[in-house]
């Protein structure tokens, strides 16, 4: 989807806030810990290339989801190590060697498929993924890890790292987290040769389980100033939200009592009301379930009335405002603020999803 720069809807990205968040997190982890910035999914909706360029001197490398995201960074001139967290297709191995990417190895079947196709693995760098309880990709048995490491090294592969991912690091109970940690440690203890880089800490682990950090951390949600737990756990220190979502009033009118708004005529004015239209809708990632949520105009909460359309919403104003008046959907306006977590709570989801769903139609502006 192409960006639409000729309408007032935009996401403002505070790159300085992201850098400050990295520095803040770095000040609370063991000295010498490598910092890997997770910029997958277009840097959680913040813009992968712009974010990576802004923080490249503050981190030791980047993490992405797939090889196409990695290629985008390399072609933009980013030279630091890039770890691809997902499983890559066999055909991607040649690209990984060409662009100097680090691949994730999650199973013996993948290695065997490479060997069956006689793919030249010499010079490839990989990290082994351990499924300690997340249930997605990764080795579960120590014997398989040892076999994989031997096979890879026999064929000229550099097994640089090993990692896992915690399912409940952002929850109040530590029971499952501790069980996962013990499984991971057991596998590490069984290895004849532990790879140089060992990382298990996502944002939540980095924030609330700092004592379990190995020698690298993966900074994701928290790097963008978001609380990985939503409202479950308090942040141990301040982080600055980097994204503001704004638009403006493009149409304002007074409607009589009984007037209806939106598809399905689900909202009917019970008195004379001032109704305004804002050019943002579900095609932009402002989903249909946001009906009745309030946005900010002139420091005042104004409810979304009627269903969210593909391209527009209608809101009820306390009085007439001129066209072009700013509307804040995420961020501060006057003395009020709407956070991504508040939006997520209203949607019964997580703040990760809120920012990731903001579509490419919304231009990102950086400062």
UniProtKB/Swiss-Prot annotation:
Its EC number is 5.1.1.1. Pathway: Amino-acid biosynthesis; D-alanine biosynthesis; D-alanine from L-alanine: step 1/1. SUPFAM superfamilies: Alanine racemase C-terminal domain-like, PLP-binding barrel. The modification N6-(pyridoxal phosphate)lysine is found at residue 40. It catalyses: L-alanine = D-alanine. The keyword Isomerase applies. Substrate binds at residues 136, 310. It comes from the Bacteria. Its cofactor is pyridoxal 5'-phosphate. Pfam families: Ala_racemase_C, Ala_racemase_N. Belongs to the alanine racemase family. Homodimer. Catalyzes the interconversion of L-alanine and D-alanine. May also act on other amino acids. This is Alanine racemase. It comes from Streptococcus pneumoniae serotype 4 (strain ATCC BAA-334 / TIGR4). The lineage of its organism: Bacteria, Bacillati, Bacillota, Bacilli, Lactobacillales. The gene is alr.
């Amino acid at each position: 989807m192409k960006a639409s720069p000729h309408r007032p809807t935009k996401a403002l990205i505070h790159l300085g806030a992201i850098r400050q968040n990295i520095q803040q997190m770095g000040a609370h982890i063991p000295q010498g810990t490598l910092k890997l910035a997770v910029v997958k999914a277009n840097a959680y909706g913040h813009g992968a290339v712009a974010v990576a360029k802004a923080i490249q001197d503050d981190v030791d490398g980047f993490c992405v989801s797939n090889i196409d995201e990695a290629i985008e960074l390399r072609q933009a001139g980013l030279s630091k190590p890039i770890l691809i967290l997902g499983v890559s297709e066999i055909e991607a191995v040649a690209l990984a060697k060409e662009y100097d990417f680090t691949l994730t190895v999650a199973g013996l079947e993948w290695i065997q498929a490479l060997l069956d196709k006689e793919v030249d693995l010499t010079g490839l760098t990989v990290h082994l993924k351990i499924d300690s309880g997340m249930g997605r990709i990764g080795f579960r048995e120590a014997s398989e890890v040892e076999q994989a490491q031997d096979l890879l090294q026999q064929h000229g592969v550099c097994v640089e790292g090993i990692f896992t991912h915690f399912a409940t690091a952002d929850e109040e109970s530590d029971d499952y987290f501790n069980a996962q940690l013990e499984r991971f440690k057991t596998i590490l203890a069984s290895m004849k040769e532990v790879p140089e880089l060992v990382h298990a800490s996502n944002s939540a682990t980095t924030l609330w389980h700092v004592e379990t950090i190995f020698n690298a951390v993966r900074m994701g949600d928290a790097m963008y100033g978001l609380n990985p737990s939503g409202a479950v756990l308090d942040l141990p220190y301040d982080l600055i939200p980097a994204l503001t979502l704004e638009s403006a009033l493009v149409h304002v009118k007074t409607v009589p009592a009984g007037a209806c708004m939106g598809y399905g005529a689900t909202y009917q004015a019970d008195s004379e009301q001032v109704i305004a239209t804002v050019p943002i809708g579900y095609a932009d990632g402002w989903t249909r379930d946001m009906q009745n949520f309030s946005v900010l105009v002139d420091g005042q909460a104004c409810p979304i009335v009627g269903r969210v359309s593909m391209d527009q919403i209608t809101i009820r104003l306390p009085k007439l405002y001129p066209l072009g008046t700013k509307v804040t959907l995420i961020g501060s306006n006057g003395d009020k603020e709407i956070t991504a977590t508040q939006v997520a709570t209203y949607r019964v989801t997580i703040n990760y999803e809120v920012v990731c769903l903001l579509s490419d139609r919304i231009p990102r502006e950086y400062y």
